[in-house]
C-alpha cells in the first residue's frame, strides 16, 4: 500500500513528516511526501491574530486530502482547529515531547534576568499575555518566520530574547545553537492546546493505518485540551493556554489561563479528575471559567489585539 503525506515545506514540518514517514515505513508501507504552502506560510508581514480565520497552517493540506492528492497530513497539533472539514478525521496523536515554552537569549538566562525594557520576540498572544503579566516592564515585538529566521533575528541583535516551543528546538537538534535556552515552568507559562504533539489528519479510508501511530496518554491529554478550547470557541490565535497532565497513577490535572494581550488581566483555573472521567474534564473546566467571565474576557482580548495592531 502506497501512502502520500501532505506537508508544509518548513524544516520543522519536514522533520515531523519524515518522522511519521519512517514509522509508517517500519510497518511495511511505501510512503512519499508532497509539499504544499499554506496561507500562514505565505503571509509573513502580518501578526497571525490579524490574518483571521482558522486553519492558517492546515487548510491547503486538508484540501489536498479531500481532492485525493494525499492520504494524510502531519500537523503540529496546536495548529489544528477543533472542527475538522467533513470527510477528514484526526486519526492519531503522537507521543508528546516536553510541552514547555522556552526563553532563548544570547545574554540572559531566565525571564527574571531580563532588564527593564528588554525586547522579547513572539507573535503568540498567549505567550505575550503571560509574559507581560509577569514582567510588565518588558517590550514585546512580533516575531514571524521559521525557526531559523527567528533565531537569526535574535543573533543579529533585533531582540534581547525570543520565545519558542521547546519541542520544535529539540526535534530540529538546535538546542545548542543559542547560548541560553531556558524551559519556562508551566505554572509561569501555560502551553497552547496540543503543544508538542503531532496530529495526524487523514481520510477515513486510511484511519486503520494511521491509528497505529497513536499514543494513548497524549491522545487523552490533548482530547481534554481541544474539548476545552472548543467549548470556549477559541481559535489558535486567541490568548488561551491549557495543559492537561495524565499522571502515572491515572489522576489528571488540567490547568488553563485566559486574559488580555497586555497581561493586565488574567483568569486562571484548574481541575482534578481521573482517566476514567477524562471525557468530562475539558467541559467542566470551560464551564467553570465561563461562569467566572471567560467569554467576556476573550471578547475584550480580541478587541484589544486588533486595536493594538491597527
Swiss-Prot record:
- Supply one GO CC term from the record: cytoplasm
| Record-linked Gene3D superfamilies | Periplasmic binding protein-like II, Porphobilinogen deaminase, C-terminal domain
Question: What does the UniProt record say this protein does?
Answer: Tetrapolymerization of the monopyrrole PBG into the hydroxymethylbilane pre-uroporphyrinogen in several discrete steps.
One Gene Ontology term of the molecular function aspect: hydroxymethylbilane synthase activity
What is one GO biological process annotated to this record? Answer: protoporphyrinogen IX biosynthetic process
Give additional notes from the record.
The porphobilinogen subunits are added to the dipyrromethane group.
Its recorded name reads Porphobilinogen deaminase
Q: Which organism is it from?
A: Nitratiruptor sp. (strain SB155-2)
Q: Tell me which EC number(s) this protein carries.
A: 2.5.1.61
